[in-house]
Amino acid sequence: MSDSLLDAAQQLTSTGEERGVALRALGGVGVLMHCPVARATGPHRAFADLDVAVPRDAARQVPELFEAAGYDADKRFNALQGDRRMIFHGPAGKVDVFVGVFEMCHKLDLSPRLGLERETLTASDLLMTKLQVVEVNQKDVDDAALLLSEHELREGPGDHIDLAYLSTLVYDDWGLWRTATGTLGVVAERRDDVAAPARAIAGALEGAPKGKRFRMRARIGERKRWYELPDEIK
């Protein structure tokens, strides 16, 4: 299933390019696609499904794109949630499509970022989709560790973890900062091999400038829940 989902991701990104849609892989499949050493050496873990993202303004093209690629739509789900998420089923398995915004425990606006790479989100965005998980599991930890093991920490755009960009995400978002730094602590605790970069990112987020909304929310702290749980998202 792992290799078939990898193939499906490449097929869908290619079909998207042909139709002018910047469809990009994320999740475990996207992480593996962005980590060439791990992808070449294997073995790959089994993936349950494929997550992809498309720009908000491409939402109307998505059903036709997937139909052309041989997928069946989850019509009920898509009718109810299609403005932000869609689900399709094909020979390789289930594909979950995020429209513009990645919305799980926290919201990440992906639309302006989808044109930066050809097949996946950037390493920085892939990492943040893992760091925003509150109830982090071992797969999330391992995915984050894989990204940290194959990408340097730098400032500015490029094929690395962009500390400046990550800092902008938490500038006015205390909740995302709280979750991301907490998850980095879990990664550092469970994976000695990437503890140093995990702690370095946490330190960068801690020391980065913060906006007024961040400071106001920080006063409330953990007395009020700062995240959503995916199954509670309407």
Question: What would you call each of these model-derived segments?
Answer:
Residues M1-A25, V37-A46, V99, E103, ...:
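The feature captures the alpha-helical scaffold/lid subdomain characteristic of nucleotidyltransferase
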Residues H34, R56, T129:
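Active-site-proximal flexible loops/turns
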